[in-house]
Regions:
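Acidic/histidine-rich alpha-helical segments that form the ligand environment
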Residues: 20, 24-25, 41-95
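Conserved alpha-helical segments that form or flank metal/cofactor-binding pockets of metalloenzymes
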Residues: 2-36, 98-103
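Generic structural signal for short, solvent-exposed loop/turn connectors between secondary structure elements
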Residues: 15, 38-50, 102-105
Length: 105
């Protein structure tokens, strides 16, 4: 499954970009960006279907998180911030769809 290597490498790069966007948003709102991992277990596997399923569930959670955040940012009235987070939201939606299609194969 060599195509998975490229997929997950792209996801890593996208995640780093998203983290920088969110960190900037937090700082812009006078917050303090911290790194604290949630308690969701990390699944270690060589089963590609399991990898894709775990990634799919993670991306769905990200989509839901950004879906909840966007209206809050819209209330603030900061269109630049809204636009940057909306791009992340759309990226996450695209990832969900890509993973859904990969799981169908």
């Amino acid at each position: 499954r060599l195509h998975l290597t490229a997929h997950f490498n792209n996801e890593v790069n996208e995640s780093v970009t998203h983290a920088a966007t969110v960190r900037s948003a937090i700082v812009k709102l006078d917050g303090t960006a911290i790194t604290e991992r949630d308690d969701t277990p990390i699944v270690h596997t060589s089963n590609y279907k399991e990898m894709l399923t775990e990634a799919y569930e993670t991306e769905k959670k990200a989509v839901e998180t950004y879906r909840q955040i966007l209206p809050l940012v819209e209330k603030i009235g900061d269109t630049e911030l809204y636009d940057s987070l909306e791009v992340v939201y759309f990226d996450e939606q695209r990832s969900v769809e890509e993973l859904r299609m990969m799981l169908k194969d």
